[in-house]
């Protein structure tokens, strides 16, 4: 899998911002078929940083019901919490 297909987009939320400030971690939405090794190599090659570790959270699609009937599914996704090596930094929205 190509590195540009692994990282979908960075996650920007209150929790992701808190994690980024408290520990040297960055959160990404990633391709559901990507594994930890591929995610690590993709972040290192795209952002030119050293990665200390990767934790992955997978959310499966949930059935949506309306008036007792199943109407579809919510989207499933995979998030990667990437821990950067000490001294490394990725600036997404600095100064915004």
Curated annotation (Swiss-Prot):
**Gene Ontology annotations for the cellular component aspect, listed alphabetically:** ribonucleoprotein complex; ribosome
Q: Which GO terms describe its biological process?
A: translation
The terms under GO molecular function for this entry are: rRNA binding; structural constituent of ribosome
The reply to whether RNA-binding figures as a keyword in the UniProt entry is: yes
Question: Which UniProt key words apply to this protein?
Answer: Ribonucleoprotein, Ribosomal protein, RNA-binding, rRNA-binding
Query: InterPro entries given for it?
Result: Nucleotide-bd_a/b_plait_sf, Ribosomal_uL23-like, Ribosomal_uL23/eL15/eS24_sf, Ribosomal_uL23_CS
What functional role does this protein have? One of the early assembly proteins it binds 23S rRNA. One of the proteins that surrounds the polypeptide exit tunnel on the outside of the ribosome. Forms the main docking site for trigger factor binding to the ribosome.
Which family does the record assign?
Belongs to the universal ribosomal protein uL23 family.
This protein is called: Large ribosomal subunit protein uL23
Organism, per UniProt?
Answer: Oleidesulfovibrio alaskensis (strain ATCC BAA-1058 / DSM 17464 / G20) (Desulfovibrio alaskensis)
Mind giving the lineage of the organism this protein is from? Bacteria, Pseudomonadati, Thermodesulfobacteriota, Desulfovibrionia, Desulfovibrionales
